[in-house]
A protein has these predicted regions:
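Conserved active-site motif detector
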Residues: 1-97
Length: 97
């Protein structure tokens, strides 16, 4: 299995204070819509629900991490992921495909 990194963004829009922790388990859920058919929602099942999205812009993704557009065809409708690094705004996470 290959480990792919992606940037989690939008967490600050869902919560006033950061809830992200290294090692936190996440679920990726494909949520295409008419504005962005490559939308991938990031969910925590520990009572928090949606905490953000996979970055889909060169302006929001960090380093060499995958954008939602590159990742969407590599995962099922739901996929497990984990936070690797917590940043000021968001996190770098990994998913095994």
């Amino acid at each position: 299995m290959e480990k792919i990194y992606f940037t989690l963004v939008g967490e600050h829009l869902c919560f006033e204070h950061s809830v992200l922790e290294k090692g936190m388990e996440l679920t990726l859920v494909k949520k295409p819509n008419e504005l962005d058919p490559e939308t991938i929602e990031v969910v925590v099942s520990e009572g928090l629900g949606k905490i953000g999205y996979v970055a889909n812009s060169v302006y929001t993704r960090k380093g060499t991490s995958y954008s939602a557009g590159r990742l969407i065809d590599k995962i099922e409708d739901n996929a497990s992921a984990v936070i690797e690094y917590v940043l000021d705004r968001g996190a770098i996470c990994s998913v095994c495909v």
